Amino acid sequence: MTRDIDRENYAELYGPTTGDKVRLGDTELFAKVEEDLRTHGDEAVFGGGKTLRDGLGMAPGVTQAEGALDWVLTNATIIDPILGIVAADIGIRNGEIAGIGKAGNPDTMDGVDMVVGPSTDVYPAEGKIATAGGLDIHIHFNSAQLHEHALSGGITTMLGGGYGGGATTCTTGPENVKRFLQAAEAWPVNVGFYGKGNASDPGPLREQVEAGVCGLKLHEDWGSTPETINTCLEVAEDEDVQVCMHTDTLNEAGFLENTFGAVDGRTMHLFHIEGAGGGHAPDIMEMVGEPNMLPSSTNPSMPYTDNTFDEHLDMVMVCHHLNPDVPEDVAFAESRVRAETIAAEDVLHDMGAISMMTSDSQAMGRIAEVIPRTWQTASKMKSQRGPLPEDEGTGADNHRIKRYIAKYTVNPAISAGIEEHVGTLEPGKLADICLWDPAFFGVKPAMTFKGGFPVHSEMGEANGSLMTCEPILQRERAGAVGKAKHAISLSFVSPAAAEAGIDEEYGLDSRVVPIEGARTPGKDDMVYNSYCPDDIEVDPETFEVRVDGEHVTCEPSSELPLAQRYLL
């Protein structure tokens, strides 16, 4: 027996299907489902009178050891830079994504490729958007509570360093690296720490790599000279770790051309490429045209608004220990904050020329705002620039959506050498998954799975009669406590440190995983964000940015989506 139902009714019951569109929060962005991997009429649904019962959608004779899923997220709308925008069930086994497709009982349902058994738990994802957990790979680990805010904002992987004067994203020296890896045992997230890359002698750099850093960070506050840049890159090439750089704002040791010569074509992740966060003034942004440079933005300058310029001056003064009574310190701050390059930054993101978004947490940026700032920028660019050429005539924004979600998922993973484990919902990767109510997409995840287990979600009062009793807040789930947090989290370290067995030496319970291939990515590998302008110039007097001769700019916004409707 078959029954026909209209699209609206189907979407209410099982979520959208092929051709349906979903608005992302209160943005101007609409995602259109490109493919539905479920079998219509045989949907997997949990609850009283629903299909996932013994002998119906649940196969009673299949154990976990025989292949039954540990978890199934039913009828999700997936937004992923690699998989696309699809409707499907998501299967989880042993902490990893087991499959994207149709889950259920193959004896009673058609098209089943993932078995639901008595050992399978269910998260009803009908009407929810599923994305890979976000990555923030520019974190100042100043606060031990950062992970709480990261999870509340959809971030499940945190790479960076601390303390470095609180300003430099460096964990300096082997003893401090050891202590941070031990401290991270308390956090139910994936972590990795950058060592100080500023040394003209390779010895101190190698000892940090051997101690367990996942990369090296060059920062102007420690002296980003051509000599330290070259030495750092030589060590990184030998040890297969990434180098992240904050260049010389004051141009004391050389200009952009000198830094470019010191890099000499080797791969490097350039932080806050626009320059307000630091870097050769005023032309660091010209590096987005280099094929070996992997550029990222930090979220305080994204998107450009009426308040951006004024806010940055105060933040620079505080972050870099500058004195407002010293004219040279004020001049330093003012040289970094340029409305013209900030305005160009939004457009370069929309063109796919800037590949990644990060926070610069507690050193001008906000860790919980990586994802909302990304989508605010995407929505602003649609409003000001119109549909991308690839989206013309589709009635949706799929290409733009994939471009922007890649900025905080797959591209940071590729840059850091950890894409084998995180960054997409492809089978075989760690099951770090955020589920979003479409109305709250990009701001407040409804549920976050970490390593295949619930770690954080919207949750009511624990003494309430139901989970929905107010106040509903972002709260820890079982995966965040006890020994579970070790089982669901990875600590990313250098290949040398993993081979040396630092997990046993340091007494670590979380899984220690070596990064791999951090020296090979180029701009061409940045998914949906690989555009390398042939010619990009920053005018040294007006700071206007020109790409292939055309002035690139946008208007500041006075109002944004995903803002005061959602957050006090």
UniProtKB/Swiss-Prot annotation:
Enzyme class: hydrolase
Catalytic residues, chain numbering: 320 (proton donor)
Residues involved in Ni(2+) 1 binding: 138, 140, 217, 360
GO biological process, one term: urea catabolic process
GO molecular function, one term: nickel cation binding
EC numbers, comma separated: 3.5.1.5
Recorded metabolic or biological pathway in which this protein acts: Nitrogen metabolism; urea degradation; CO(2) and NH(3) from urea (urease route): step 1/1
Domain Urease: 133-568
Cofactor mode of binding and number, as noted: Binds 2 nickel ions per subunit.
Binding site for substrate: 219
Top-level taxon of the source organism: Archaea
Catalytic activity: urea + 2 H2O + H(+) = hydrogencarbonate + 2 NH4(+)
Cofactor(s), names only, from the UniProt record: Ni cation
PTM field: Carboxylation allows a single lysine to coordinate two nickel ions.
GO cellular component: cytoplasm
HAMAP family (alphabetical): Urease_alpha
Family that this chain belongs to: Belongs to the metallo-dependent hydrolases superfamily. Urease alpha subunit family.
UniProt subunit comment: Heterotrimer of UreA (gamma), UreB (beta) and UreC (alpha) subunits. Three heterotrimers associate to form the active enzyme.
UniProt name for this protein: Urease subunit alpha
Native organism taxonomy: Archaea, Methanobacteriati, Methanobacteriota, Stenosarchaea group, Halobacteria
